[in-house]
């Protein structure tokens, strides 16, 4: 067991060495990128040892040796939890980061600050591993905020672009909303249970726990881009493609789902929280799948597919199947990272062109990238015996065979079908047909720094699901028998999506252009969500503030109260004092009449 914990700590320690080295010589070392890549590879090999030992012995362990601080009766220690979730996630995250870093050496080779970029990527990975291995909420919060700030720095990497700065700020602001939920939950656990250690929280499980669990759901919704807090995820595509690949596969966006997986002992008997997560996930997975249908930016389509898959993971949490949700996190990481690397290969070769309408015919020019992209799209749809099938199919089976909300199930099945539609759309537009890019474009995919990472992720997208699914302990007894129509539900919906996509593609060649329909506008404008939430409230606030300032300050005080009132008083006074017309005869006559009347009145006998 000592060897077991030592290898886990060694894995984390290895990753810190490039950070220390780069602090002494940040920009001058030309071999720093390959050094970081090799360090991550060594950490990946090291992390396989405790994972294999755990699968062999099936024994969890904790390390809580380093005492930080004692606040009254709260004792904070540096504590690592080495259970199934952390030990399985570490090799997956390290393998994918290793591949992405090698790809970055090709994609970012002309960037003058590439060493700093690699340092940021490594810090992003380290903070995620801190979050995954944390055994108390304080340590988890450090990792949670770490992935947030690193995503801000990486999304806004090209800080000279306004869109990149806006997207980075949007990501951090939406995550602040989620952080409010996590902080509220931490405060509740501290005031009611006087502890932040996970095992003590689970042991002191009180009912009801609706307030802290709702805070955790809010935190997960912010970090994992659930409906309402989702707009930052497609906007994050303004960052470099390696950042998108790392962000969407094994780091930040799955942190929210991982938080709920960590706290599933508190949620497994709470029907209210399960229903909330189920409905939230179902709405997210369908809404983002609809938004993906009409996007033309290849990275935006893949980003919306990520959000849709995160909604599916949230549905799985709502079905009380945390191990299935974790399996989908791991399998999804492989093919999603590969999809982003393939799109990065296409974008880089087409001189930073991201519009799929300006691609086409790439199956001849980029045969290896095309093969990987098609296999990634098929794995995303849950095609049998690819990686996605081993997690997506059991999730749909669990949904159809559990006592769940039929409305949520219908939304999830519809989103599953739409996944096949937008995946087929990428294949049709980007890879098939005639080339629609300039003929002078030079295309080359023969660089080993491009081929090798995609090749590794391609192997993972085919075999990783089988390997990972065979290592999951069955916590809830699965159904041994199922009706045939329920067993084939997921495959049927995927096949239906492919058929719809093929039919639409054949029909569009003969259809005349008309004005966009309302469903098309809804999908293209992202459900009017950015218009309503990003434009309307600021416009109303600014116009109301302007009117209040104009009415109260300008018109009332600065204009009406002082200048106009003073002028009016002076006008009345001058009118009153200078109201003489020069009519002397009339004045004398009035005096005479007045005097005459007075004399008559005084001299009149009584």
Swiss-Prot record:
Its main location: mitochondrion. It comes from the Eukaryota. GO terms for molecular function: NADH dehydrogenase (ubiquinone) activity. It is found in: Mitochondrion inner membrane. GO terms for biological process: electron transport coupled proton transport; mitochondrial electron transport, NADH to ubiquinone; mitochondrial respiratory chain complex I assembly. Keywords: Electron transport, Membrane, Mitochondrion, Mitochondrion inner membrane, NAD, Respiratory chain, Translocase, Transmembrane, Transmembrane helix, Transport, Ubiquinone. Pfam families: NADH5_C, Proton_antipo_M, Proton_antipo_N. It is an enzyme of class 7 (translocase). It is a multi-pass membrane protein. GO terms for cellular component: mitochondrial inner membrane. Its EC number is 7.1.1.2. It catalyses: a ubiquinone + NADH + 5 H(+)(in) = a ubiquinol + NAD(+) + 4 H(+)(out). Core subunit of respiratory chain NADH dehydrogenase (Complex I) which is composed of 45 different subunits. Belongs to the complex I subunit 5 family. Core subunit of the mitochondrial membrane respiratory chain NADH dehydrogenase (Complex I) which catalyzes electron transfer from NADH through the respiratory chain, using ubiquinone as an electron acceptor. Essential for the catalytic activity and assembly of complex I. NCBIfam families: NDH_I_L (TIGR01974). PANTHER family: NADH-UBIQUINONE OXIDOREDUCTASE CHAIN 5 (PTHR42829:SF2). This is NADH-ubiquinone oxidoreductase chain 5. The lineage of its organism: Eukaryota, Metazoa, Chordata, Craniata, Vertebrata.
């Amino acid at each position: 067991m000592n060897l077991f914990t030592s290898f886990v700590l060694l894995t984390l320690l290895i990753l810190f060495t490039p950070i220390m080295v780069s602090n002494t010589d940040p920009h001058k070392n030309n071999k720093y990128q390959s050094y970081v890549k090799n360090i991550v590879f060594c950490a990946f090999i090291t992390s396989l040892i405790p994972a294999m030992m755990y699968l062999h012995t099936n024994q969890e362990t904790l390390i809580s040796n380093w005492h930080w601080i004692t606040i009254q009766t709260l004792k904070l220690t540096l504590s690592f939890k080495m259970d199934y979730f952390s030990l399985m996630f570490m090799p997956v995250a390290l393998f994918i980061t290793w591949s992405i870093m090698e790809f970055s050496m090709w994609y970012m080779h002309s960037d003058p600050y590439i060493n700093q970029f690699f340092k940021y990527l490594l810090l992003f990975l380290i903070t995620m591993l801190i979050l995954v291995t944390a055994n108390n909420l304080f340590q988890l919060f450090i990792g949670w905020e770490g992935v947030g700030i690193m995503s801000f720095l990486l999304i806004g990497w090209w800080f000279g672009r306004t869109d990149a700065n806006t997207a980075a700020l949007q990501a951090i602001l939406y995550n602040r909303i989620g952080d409010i939920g996590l902080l509220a939950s931490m405060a509740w656990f501290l005031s009611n249970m006087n502890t932040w250690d996970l095992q003590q929280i689970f042991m002191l499980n009180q009912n009801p726990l609706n307030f802290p669990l709702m805070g955790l759901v809010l935190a997960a919704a912010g970090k994992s881009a659930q409906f309402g807090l989702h707009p930052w995820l497609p906007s994050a595509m303004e960052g470099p493609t390696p950042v998108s690949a790392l962000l969407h596969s094994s780091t930040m966006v799955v942190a929210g789902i991982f938080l709920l997986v960590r706290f599933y002992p508190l949620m497994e008997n709470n029907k209210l929280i399960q229903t909330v997560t189920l409905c939230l996930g179902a709405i997210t997975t369908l809404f983002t799948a609809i938004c993906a249908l009409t996007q033309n930016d290849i990275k935006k389509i893949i980003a919306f597919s990520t959000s849709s898959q995160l909604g599916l993971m949230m549905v799985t949490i709502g079905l009380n199947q945390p191990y299935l949700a974790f399996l989908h996190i791991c399998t999804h990481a492989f093919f999603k990272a590969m999809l982003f690397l393939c799109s990065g290969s296409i974008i880089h070769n087409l001189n930073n062109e991201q519009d799929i309408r300006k691609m086409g015919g790439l199956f001849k020019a980029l045969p290896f990238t095309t093969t990987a992209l098609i296999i990634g799209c098929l794995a995303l749809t849950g095609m049998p015996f690819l990686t996605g099938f081993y997690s997506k199919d059991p999730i749909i089976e669990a949904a159809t065979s559990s006592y769940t909300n039929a409305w949520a199930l219908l939304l999830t099945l519809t989103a599953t079908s739409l996944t096949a539609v937008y995946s087929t759309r990428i294949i049709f537009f980007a890879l098939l047909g005639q080339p629609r890019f300039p003929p002078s474009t030079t295309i080359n995919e023969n660089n080993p720094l491009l081929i090798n990472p995609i090749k590794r992720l391609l192997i993972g997208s085919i075999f990783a699901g089988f390997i990972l699914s065979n290592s999951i302990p069955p916590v809830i007894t699965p159904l041994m028998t199922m009706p045939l129509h329920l067993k084939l539900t997921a495959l049927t919906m995927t096949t239906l999506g492919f058929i719809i996509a093929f039919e639409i593609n054949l029909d569009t060649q003969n259809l005349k252009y008309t004005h966009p329909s309302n469903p098309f506008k809804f999908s293209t404008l992202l459900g009017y969500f950015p218009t309503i939430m990003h434009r309307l409230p600021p416009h109303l606030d600014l116009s109301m503030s302007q009117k209040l300032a104009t009415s109260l300050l300008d018109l009332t005080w600065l204009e009406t109260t002082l200048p106009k009132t003073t002028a009016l008083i002076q006008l009345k006074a001058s009118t009153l004092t200078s109201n003489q017309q020069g009519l002397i005869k009339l004045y004398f006559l009035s005096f005479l009449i007045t005097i005459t009347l007075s004399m008559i009145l005084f001299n009149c006998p009584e």
